[in-house]
From Swiss-Prot:
Its cofactor is Mg(2+). Keywords: Activator, ATP-binding, Cytoplasm, Kinase, Nucleotide-binding, Nucleus, Phosphoprotein, Serine/threonine-protein kinase, Transcription, Transcription regulation, Transferase. SMART domains: S_TKc. The lineage of its organism: Eukaryota, Fungi, Dikarya, Ascomycota, Saccharomycotina. Residues 23-302 form the Protein kinase domain. Proline-directed serine/threonine-protein kinase involved in a signal transduction pathway that is activated by changes in the osmolarity of the extracellular environment. Controls osmotic regulation of transcription of target genes. Transmembrane segments: none annotated. It comes from the Eukaryota. GO terms for cellular component: cytoplasm; nucleus. It holds the Pfam family Pkinase. Its EC number is 2.7.11.24. This is Mitogen-activated protein kinase HOG1. PROSITE patterns: MAPK (PS01351), PROTEIN_KINASE_ATP (PS00107), PROTEIN_KINASE_DOM (PS50011), PROTEIN_KINASE_ST (PS00108).
Amino acid sequence: MATHEEFIRTQVFGTVFEITNRYTDLNPVGMGAFGLVCSATDTLAGQPVAIKKIMKPFSTAVLAKRTYRELKLLKHLRHENLICLQDIFLSPLEDIYFVTELQGTDLHRLLQTRPLEKQFVQYFLYQILRGLKYVHSAGVIHRDLKPSNILINENCDLKICDFGLARIQDPQMTGYVSTRYYRAPEIMLTWQKYDVEVDIWSAGCIFSEMIEGKPLFPGKVHVHQFSIITDLLGSPPRDVIITICSEDTLKFVTSLPHRDPVPFQERFKAVEPDAVDLLGRMLVFDPKKRITAADALVHPYLAPYHDPTDEPIAEAQFDWDFNDADLPVDTWRVMMYSEILDFHKIGGSDGQIDTNAAFDDQVAAATAGPMLPLWLNSNININNSHPVNIQVQLLRHQQPRITVVYQ
C-alpha cells in the first residue's frame, strides 16, 4: 500500500541523518569507516531499533558492491545469534539505511567495564560459536570478528553484526581487512589463502580476552603481531611455512630464531582445564588443525549450553555469483533497488509481480520517495524466481515509473 511517511533531516555528529518520521529519538551509538549507527524508536512497531547509515553508497563501484554484498548477506542470514535486518530504505540524498534490532551494548564496551564471570564467558562463547556454525554452513566467512562486532542485550542475548567484509569460502582470497589483534596468522603469512578457520582464530582471541579482560595478542604493527603470536605458539610448523606465497614473507619467517611453544596449561594456570583445552584447539597455527565451530559446540567446556537440536545450519548456501562481477555504479544501483523491492515483498509468495496501480505505490514506499533523475534498464531477479526486465524511470519529486516484462 502507499506510504505516508515523510523524511526528516537531522544532524548527528556533523553527519546528515535523513530518515522517515516512523523513526524518532535518534541517538548516536557508533561510528565506523563506512557509516554511522544511531539508536531510535520505531513508532510503528513500538520498539527500539538501531539504524545504520551507509554514506554515499553509490559514490564508487567499490562502495556500491560492498553495500550490495552486506544487504544480500543480511537478507540471507537469519539466525538468533546474528543481527536481523528489520527495514531498509533509500533516502532522497541516496544514502542507504539499514534498520536492525537494538542491542544494549557490545562486548568491547562490556569488557572495558568489568571482568566477566565464568558463566558469562561460557554463554557468550557458546552463542558466538553457534552463530559461526550457521554462518560457515552458508558458505560465508565473517572476516572481521572482534568484540565491537558482537552485540549483547540486557538478557545476555548475543548477536554477531557487521557483515560488510564477509566473503565467500574460497581458498584463493584476494585482500583482507580486519582488526590486527584478532587476525589469524595465515592472513599475515599467506594473505590470499584462508577459509572459515580465520573466524575460529578470532573467536579464540575473543575467548581469551573474555577470560583475562585484555587482548591476548595486542600487536602494535604487523611484524610485532606475528612475533607475539610466536611467543605463545612457537615457530610456525613446516606445513604452514610451505603455504607462504610471498618471497619476502618467507624470507622474513625463515630468518627468525626458532621458538618453542608455551604450553597453554602453563600460560593460563588459573583457568579451568576444559577452557584451556578448547582455547588451545581454537588457537592453532595450522588452520587445517583448528577446531570447527560445530565441533567446538560439543566440547565439554560448553556442555551446560550445548543442545544439538537447537544449533541450526543454513537451509541454503549463500549465492556469491555477483561477487566477482566488475560492474558500473548504475548497474549496482539497479541490483540494489531490486533487493530493496524484494525485501519489502513487492512480489507475492509465488514470486509474481503486481503491475497494477498499487504496485507503483509499493515501489515508491520501498525506494523511499524522491530519487535522482536516472534511467535504469537491467535484467534482474525479483524474489529469486522470475527473471524479468525492469525499466525504471526515477524522476525527482515523482513516483518511479516501472515497466515489468517477463522473459
